Amino acid sequence: MEEQQNEALEQRQNCCCLTGHRSLPSDPDRLAELRQNLRRLICDLAQQDITTFYTGGALGFDTMAAMMVLELKSRLPQLRLHLALPYPEQAKRWSRTDRLLYEQIKEHADRVYLVSMEYSAVCMKKRNYFMVDRSRACAYYMVNATRSGTAQTVNYARNQGCKLFDLLEKQPERFVKTPQQQQISWSEQVIVRESYPTAQEKSDPEK
């Protein structure tokens, strides 16, 4: 048992979870900046031997982050993409195009985890905590710092001692140590759009 715990701790040292909202910036410049910050951070973390990245497989930021890791693997082959899926039929109500992309990401991921075998009110939360529990660091895209699943995940990661990286900062390497540092005072002014909204996603507060 102790050997397994030590192995899990060692694996955690090489992992970072990526979390964010389903809604991405509608402003092309803000979206480009987010992508640039994410790309730079993944490359920087790889130099620190953090090479395994967890994403939750949802639409919006999760999809963008997963595709970024897969894109960078062409020149950083040590990178690994781990998908933590909340339940088997997550993509059932998505559009055909989104489902095809989802299946392609699953096919190219290094590992795929099913956190729950069926949908429940807490399956998204379980998925988020699953990723944090296996990560040394947590990089996040968050414009709602109070009422969102992303905020809940970031707070849990902070309590677990993860290094936090705010992808909206100009220097995403900044380690967020306190809730005061993490707050984004101008967040409510950022224009966002609902990416591929469905009735289920609109009612789901987990992202």
Language-model features: locations:
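Long, low-complexity, intrinsically disordered segments
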Residues: 194-207
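Acidic/glycine-enriched connector segments
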Residues: 2-187
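Intrinsic disorder/low-complexity segments, especially N-terminal tails and targeting/processing regions
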Residues: 186, 192-194
